[in-house]
Amino acid sequence: MQANHHALCPQKNAACRITLAIIRVMCYSIGEEINLHKKSVTLGCMIMKTNQKTVEKKERGISKYIPAFAMFAVFETVAVSLWLSLDNLFYLLNFSYIGTCIAIGLALFAGGWKHARRFVQFAVGSYMLVYLGIISNENMQLEGFWYYLFTGVFEAATIHYAVAKIFGPLIFGRGWCGYACWTAMILDLLPYKQPQKPRKKGLGFIRYIMFALSFGLVAALFLCHAGNLERIMFWLFLGGNALYYVIGIVLAFAFKDNRAFCKYICPITVFLKPMSYFALFRIHCDESKCVGCGKCLKVCPMNVECNKESRERVNGTECILCFECKKACPVKAIK
C-alpha cells in the first residue's frame, strides 16, 4: 500500500502543478482583459473630454465675434431705415461703410490684432473729416449740429449726432471717442498713450463752457442775419478742427496725457456722457478673478476704474471701449 501511495504522489503533484499553471494563465488572461477594458474606458473618456474641449473652444471662438456681428447689424439697421425713410442712397452707403469698418475692426481685435482699433479710427475718422467735412462741405462739428437744428433740417450733422452721439451711446457708450473721432485719431499718435498722472479734478466744467460757446456762436449768426451761412459753417469746421488739434496737442504735452482734451475740453461729451451711463456694450470685471495688480488702471487712457463692476460716473461715462485694460489683465478678469 505504501509503495502505491508513493507512486501516486508524483502524479498528484504534477496534476496540481498543471492545474495551478492553468489557473495562473486564466487569471493573467482575465487580468489583461480587465486592464485592457480599463484602458479602453480611460481612452474613451479622454476622447470625450477632448471632443468636449474642442466644442467649447469652437463655441468660444464663435462667441468672441458676436460684438462685431452685433455692431454691423445695428449700423445696417440704421442705414436701411434712413435710406427708406428719406429716400436717399447716401445714408445707406454712409452708415453701411461705417458699420462695416467697425465690425471688421472688432473682428480683427477678437482675432488678436493689436492695431485693430487704430484701423477703425483712420478708416472712419479720415472718411468723416476729409470726405464728409472737407470735400462734401458738411460741418460735422457741434456748430454744424446747431446750424441744421436751427434751420429745421433733419439731415447731415443732425442725423450724425442723433446716431453717434445722442442715442447711439445707449448701445455702444462712448465708442465714438475710441473708434471714430477724427480729433482723437490724431491725438492718439502722440507719445503719452498711458496717462502719467491721475485725472485732474475740477477741470471738467470747461467742456460745458465750450458747449455753451458753440451754441452761442451759431445763435448769434442767426440773430445777426449773417449772409452765406453755409460758407461760414465750412470755415468754422476747418477753423474749429484746427483749434481742437492745437489745444489737444498742447494739453497732451502739458499733462503728459494724449486724452487730456477728451477729459476736460471736448464739448461733445456733454451729449455722450449721460447716455453712456446706460450703455449696453460696456467693460465688465469679474472681481472674483481680479488679483488687484492694477495693470488695467495704468494702461487705461481715460483713467477709468475698470477693475470695479459699477455704473459710477467714471466707469459709466468715461470708458471709450479701447480694451487696453482687457489686453493688460493677466488673469482675464476683464471682458
Please tell me what each predicted stretch does:
Residues M1, H6-C9, R282, R311:
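Secretory-pathway extracellular proteins and peptide precursors enriched for disulfide-bonded cysteines
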Residues H5-H6, H37, H225, H284:
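Histidine (H) residue identity feature
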Residues K12-A15, C27, K64:
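Intrinsically disordered, low-complexity N-terminal regions enriched in serine/proline/glycine
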Residues I47-N307, T317, K327, V331-K335:
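Non-ligating segments of multi-cofactor redox enzymes
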Residues E309-C322:
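Short linker/helix segments within small regulatory modules
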